Amino acid sequence: MSLTESVKSEREFRKRQAFIGREQDILSVSESLMADKGVRKVSVNTIAARTGIGKGTIYKHFDSKRGLLIAIAERHYSTLFELLGRPTDPAQALSDWIEARLSGARQSILIRELTETLADDQRALSKIQESQIRMRKRLAQVLTGSSTTRGESMERAMWLESLVQGALVEMESPLKSRSFDVDQWIESIRRVASVLSSQPKQSEKDQRLTYL
């Protein structure tokens, strides 16, 4: 590679990194604004004003507000997927995943709200669902230590997710007890996750016998 080509390559790399960094900034600011004000009350103009990035530049990253919402949801599930990616320490991976879901309750609630906002857009929902399923499959693998993500493995993942969702609903409830303690909930769900991951996986034959 000549010096000129090397300089050009380096320039392109820096340009690409700046683009990625700016995109992440847009997503983070959008997420914060929407968590505070609600998805429908935050416009692209509002995001542009808060980030100091021109509206036209934002549209270079996302073709519409809907595209921005999809990207926020995809990033959310991708982050959870990465937290579960510790093959050498699955117990810690599960613990980090649970804490991220409950300590970051505002974010989890935001994802639900923006998903409801996109309820009439099947293509958007399909893209978000792909990210969710990818994360759920990883969760199933971590819980059972199995490469399969069907049957009992997926059931365990869904049980754990249901517990987390229940805790999030309780956090939002106007009937929430004054003594409600997020840390206690996190610890309780960690114990449940430990039980789920320590239970031996039934063979397919055993599972069939359960229903006889």
Regions found by a protein language model. Give the residues of each.
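C-terminal peripheral helix-coil segments that are non-catalytic and often amphipathic
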Residues: M1-E10, S103, K137-G145, V169-L212
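Amphipathic alpha-helical packing segments from all-alpha helical-bundle domains
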Residues: F81, D96, Q122-T148, M154-M158, ...
